[in-house]
Amino acid sequence: MPVKDLKAWFNELDKKLNDHNRQVAKRILIELHNRLDTLIKVGLGYLTLSRLANSLSGGESQRIQLTRSLGSNLTNSLYILDEPSIGLHSRDTTNLIKVLKELRDLGNTVVVVEHDEMMMREADHIIDMGPLASHLGGEVVATGDYDEII
């Protein structure tokens, strides 16, 4: 069952519970709804519950970790993501940016290695490592926000 269908199933379950059962399940259902909503926001509504973890792409895995992190309410943590927008439709990239900003607004530091222009436009600060930045180290060629660098 895809995540988006599971969300719909839980929405229907909420309607079917009597008052007592709804009260008993309230905290769990709130957490489930929040996590499912976040999975959908970061473009993972298509994932099925039977999907094996080792079949996920790096970007999918990172976005699942983001969902877990938002649910844990951790603050003062450092998150480092390597191109989490790979393979995303621009609508989903916009939602991913919102989720990353939520993490930041909770008091965390979010570092993203990214080449997507939309992601860079929304960054608080960019450090351009220039050519040969991969395993060769590279060097800082520009810093600032998107408009300052371009």
Regions found by a protein language model. Name each.
Residues 1-150:
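Conserved phosphate-binding elements of NTP-dependent enzyme cores
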